[in-house]
Amino acid sequence: EYLAMLEAFTTGDPDGNGVNGDTYGVSAAGFIGTEAPYTNYLPEFYQDANPSFYKAEDGTWKDGFTEDSMKSALERMAAAYKEGVIDPTTLTNGTSDCRNKFYDDSFGVFTYWAGTWATNLKTNLEANGKDGELVALPPIAEVGQYLDRVPPVWCITSACENPEGVFKYFIEPMQDGGDVQFLWTYGVEGIHWSTAEETLFAGTENEKTYADGEFHMLENREKEGTQYTKAHIDPMLALVELANDPQEESVAAEAKESAQLFNDNCKAADLVPTTDEMSEYNGDLTTLKNELIAKVVMGEITVDDAYAQFESNHGAEWSQAIVDSLNK
């Protein structure tokens, strides 16, 4: 069913320009992500495969790239690429390239952040004169659950001359549940948000009128025709409850719905520890894996050729050294 949908986006005329077949089913910022869990841009093709290290059910660490599930994933991606449902510029795309193509209706399926980004995508489509209705897809049966990546964190570096001050005046008050957290979440009154009676985007199809005292985000100064969704802290991801949080009024329905769908259908990705062997070999190993994945998907080599090159170019050796170090 998923492939049939991609084929419809590819062979039909979803952008309504009167030309069949000048669009693609799915696009991504690479055939493999640049950060763990690596598979999130094309999960329907990876399915149960993991191109990197993971902890198995028996508690041991393994390199998923060496397993048959990864070979099957490569075959699925190569077949879809050959059929034309995967955007041929996927290898060189950045996330901004994908977003811009999505806003132009150049392809149909885009795996991206749940929550706030559902609103960002919708409003940018509408700003481009496109239909802003988006459908958040639950995972297909072969995927089972989406992977929730290990979250980014605020850090105080070892080079910091006053770490206590950074914690006291930044990190701690940013999560005070009060005025400072509100500032980091919603920004500055009159710049990012307001409670004044006013109409935004007057005379356009996105016109919105707010009553006096009604909290609302203001027009984004960097993206005309859209509203801010947050300042720094995503209100749906805050660690500390914010007193007098206007979230119900500020967070759009599509953001809440997509976040809930993801939360109901995800599992946490493994946090892979570092080892000396990981530091020594994983950079070159990852580069080799990425090169082989791209060559297979684009039809330059077969899956069997890729794994022969993985062996001859020390990939299997580096992989085993890292696995052994993780299982000590």
Residue ranges of predicted features:
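Helix-loop-helix "hinge/cap" segment bordering the ligand-binding cleft or interdomain interface
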Residues: 1-36, 53-97, 101, 156-168, ...
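Glycine-rich, aromatic-lined ligand/substrate-binding cores of catalytic
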Residues: 73, 79-82, 98-116, 120-124, ...
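Conserved small-residue motifs centered on glycine
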Residues: 168-294, 300
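Short acidic (Asp/Glu) and glycine-rich catalytic loops that position anionic groups and cofactors
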Residues: 52-57, 147-150, 264-268, 288-290
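Histidine-centered catalytic/metal-binding microenvironments
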Residues: 293-328
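Extracytoplasmic/periplasmic substrate-binding proteins
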Residues: 30-86, 115-148
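P-loop NTPase catalytic cores that bind/hydrolyze ATP
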Residues: 25-31, 104-114, 285
